[in-house]
Amino acid sequence: MKLDKNKIQISIGKNPSKTFYKLQLLLKDHFPENLKTKFSFQTASGIFTGENGQIFTDEVEKIIYLGLGETSKIKIRGVAQHFFQFGEKLKKWEGVGLEIHLPKVLTNSLSADLVVYQIVNSLEQGAYAINVLAKEYKENSKKIGNVSFILQDAAKLKEAEKGLKRGKIVSRYINGVRHIAHLPANHFTPEEFVSRSKEIAKDNGLKITVFDEPQLKKEKMGGILSVCEGSDKKAKMILLEYTPVKPITKKKLAIIGKGLTFDSGGISIKPAQDMHEMKYDMCGAATAIHAIGAIAELGLGVPVIAAIGVAENMPDAAAIKPGDVYTAYNGITVEVQNTDAEGRLVLGDVLSYVGKKFKPDYMLDLATLTGAIIISLGHEAAGVMSNSDVLTNLLKEASISSDERIWEMPLWEEYSEDLKSDIADIRNVAGRAGGSLSAAKFLERFVEPGIAWAHIDIAGTAWRKKTSGTQIGNGPTGYGVRLLVDLVEKIGKKK
């Protein structure tokens, strides 16, 4: 399964399209004098004053004016969020382009690199249709016009070019996550995960290793194997390895992803309402394989491993049952009291395998693991639980620069108390209170000593209904790709 190309041709300089709109970005407190006269009626009546999000279109001159509010309050998420709509417009405009004029005050307040990077991401996501199985998708695909950037401050051109190059690469992988995440389980199976991973490996010269059922049994990966027992789709573990041509550090990062292509809950079956959304339970794994693709294509100088466990959780006569006990890869026995807490079973085996085999300096996992994290943080941030202040701080720095929000949650020992089992070493659930935190404590049992590890619960950020900042709404977001790219850059710079 190949990764789609970028939907828009984007450049810096005069727009090459035959017909295009100019998009003029305006700061409320830096309104050009000529426009004050031109918009005297509009400003007096409040129709257009440059407030953040206000739009006024001059159809005669084909100029769109977009207000960004006051300079002192401007943030990149407040700029980028407006460009999803322009990506959507380009999709419908039949070849009409967009020439984006960036004022000097904007590229002085925020770096030209960052502004162009995040605008490109928003445009590409807005222009990327996810209704790929619809008849109208195949019949109504239109030519998308060119986009170009004009900078008022010519001294910022190199910065802008850097952001453009980075944005083109990263947005392609974000849309790659969104594409496969939105596919239903009958179109995207564990086998399709293998196919997609092979394409990413081929495109970027990555080493790939696939563990099918015989290898999983040989390695005694009881967690992954127990989850798939009720499905006719066999589980897989997929490893991707990136070795930079010019490494800038010996520190190694491992990214682990949960890949449940469908989660019915198994015998502990979920309610029927909204169960269709459980096709999104593979977003952690989707992010892991696309993030390493972006990291490799950008040529970042940090060695990275991406490892994902993929399976389907279904009820069946052969399915694992509440009360069953299995032995994990690291020898721990686990009592499964709830088969709907299955993601941690898969992650446990992958975490312990990667820790023992690769001995990474840093290791993190991304998973749509608990509904409890949505109760805590809503859809605005992922929860982070870590055994390492160093890794947590690196993630916080990456979160700020990427605008993919995280929030640190505690990993206190008390949260593991209720994981005790009366028949096995540990049980897989600990009750409703602090559910995200006890889930993280469960995973911690599978992390090798000495490894800086963080668990990132993306249940609230992996898909959403409403756009917010740099996160697109109405489906999967591709959350985590930008965060991980920036994290790798931070690791590379760390002394």
UniProtKB/Swiss-Prot annotation:
Mn(2+) 1 binds at residues 263, 340, 342. Keywords: Aminopeptidase, Cytoplasm, Hydrolase, Manganese, Metal-binding, Protease. GO terms for cellular component: cytoplasm. Its main location: cytoplasm. One of its GO terms (molecular function) is metalloaminopeptidase activity. GO terms for biological process: proteolysis. This is Probable cytosol aminopeptidase. It comes from Leptospira interrogans serogroup Icterohaemorrhagiae serovar copenhageni (strain Fiocruz L1-130).
